[in-house]
C-alpha cells in the first residue's frame, strides 16, 4: 500500500518527509553567524536543494525567524550542546583579549583604515580630526520605531575626520566610528573598532553621542532641517563645542529601524559564511555593480505609470544618497577583515573609480543593515523620514524580486593560498 502524504502548501511541508533530517516542531541547534543557538523547526521545504527549514531561535523575536539550509541545522544532543558551549567560550575569550588591548587596538585599526585609503591624498587633509575617535561614547541597543520630518537641508554638528578625495566621487565626507558588530544576541557589547572582524557580520552599530558628517538623502519629499543648537541661548559660551550634543538632544534622538526582508536575510548569512568560513571573495568588479542596480531600479520606477515627475525626482535623490553612503562607508564599515587585502589592491588599480562602480549587491545589502543607525543622526522630521523609509523599503522589495540575479553564489571566487596567508 502506498503511503498517503499530507498535501503541500506553497511548496513547503507542515509534517514529516523521508528526505528531511528534522521534523516540524523539533528542538534543534542552529548556526547563526559564528555561534550556535537553540532553535525550533517551524516549517520545511523538502523539495528545495538543499532542503531548507524555517527556524525560530529560542528567546528571540519572531522577526529573526528565517529559512536556513540543512547544513546549518544540528541535532539537539549532548555532543552538539558541548560544541555550542565551546564556541561560546572561545568567543568570550576573544572578547576579553580585545578588551585588554584597549586603546592600542583602536590605534592599530585607525592606522589600517588610513593606510587602506591612502592612495590619493585628501584635499581636506588640513581639517581637524573628529573628537569622535577620542571621546568616550554612550551606546544604545539598535531598534526602535522610526520617526521623521519636514523640509530643509541635511546638517550635522561635526568636526569629522576628512576622507580621501577622489575624482567623480560625490562625497568626501568622513565616515563615522562604529560599534562592534555582532549577532542579535550581542546587543550589549561595548563599542569597538569600525572594522568588521572575521568572526562577526556587518550589522548596525550602536548609537553614539557624537554628531558626524554624512552624505545627505534629500529630495522634493525627503529633506532635512538643522539640528537644534547644543547650548541654550540662556547659557552663552565663549568656545561652544558644536560636535557634542546636549543631553536633551541626545535623549530625544530616535533610532531608525530598517527592516530587512526575510527573503534577503539568508543572503547575509551565506555572504558571511562564504567569506569568513570558506575564505572566498566576491569577484571585482562585480558583474552587476551598485551603480547599475540603482539605475535599473530607477528605470523600473519610470516604467510604472503611477510614477509622477516629482516622485521620479525624489526617487533619484534617494538613490544618489544611497550611493553616496555606500562610497563613504564601504572602506571602514562594510568589509570583513579577509576582504581588506582585496580592497587595498582594488584601490591601487582603480584610484579614480567610485566604489559603487566596482562593488555589487552583497556589499550593498550590508549597507542597509547599518543605514538605520546612520540615519538616526540626521535631522529629518517625521514626514520626511517616513517618505525616505518608504523609498528604502520599496528598493529592498526590488532586490527581493530580482534576488536570483543579484545574489548568485557564483559571484564568489576561490583565492590562492598566498592571499589567505597575507589576509590572516
Curated annotation (Swiss-Prot):
Region of interest: Disordered: 88-243
Sites bearing Phosphoserine, chain numbering: 119, 211
Composition skew (Basic and acidic residues), residue ranges: 107-116
GO molecular function: chromatin binding; enzyme regulator activity; methylated histone binding
Main location: nucleus
Biased composition (Basic residues): 97-106
Composition bias, Low complexity: 122-165, 232-242
Modified residues (Phosphothreonine): 175, 183, 196-197, 235
Listed SUPFAM superfamilies: Chromo domain-like
Cellular component, GO annotation: histone acetyltransferase complex; histone methyltransferase complex; NuA4 histone acetyltransferase complex; nucleus
Limits of the Tudor-knot domain: 23-73
Subcellular location: Nucleus
Superkingdom: Eukaryota
GO biological process, one term: DNA repair-dependent chromatin remodeling
Keyword entries, A-Z: Chromatin regulator, DNA damage, DNA repair, Nucleus, Phosphoprotein, Transcription, Transcription regulation
Domain MRG per the UniProt entry, residue ranges: 252-424
PANTHER family given in the database record: MORTALITY FACTOR 4 LIKE 2, MORTALITY FACTOR 4-LIKE PROTEIN
Quaternary state and interactors: Component of the Tip60 chromatin-remodeling complex which contains the catalytic subunit Tip60 and the subunits Domino, Tra1, Brd8, E(Pc), DMAP1, Pontin, Reptin, Ing3, Act87E, BAP55, Mrg15, MrgBP, Gas41 and YL-1.
Function in brief: Part of the Tip60 chromatin-remodeling complex which is involved in DNA repair. Upon induction of DNA double-strand breaks, this complex acetylates phosphorylated H2AV in nucleosomes and exchanges it with unmodified H2AV.
Name the UniProt record assigns to this protein: NuA4 complex subunit EAF3 homolog
Recorded name of the encoding gene: MRG15
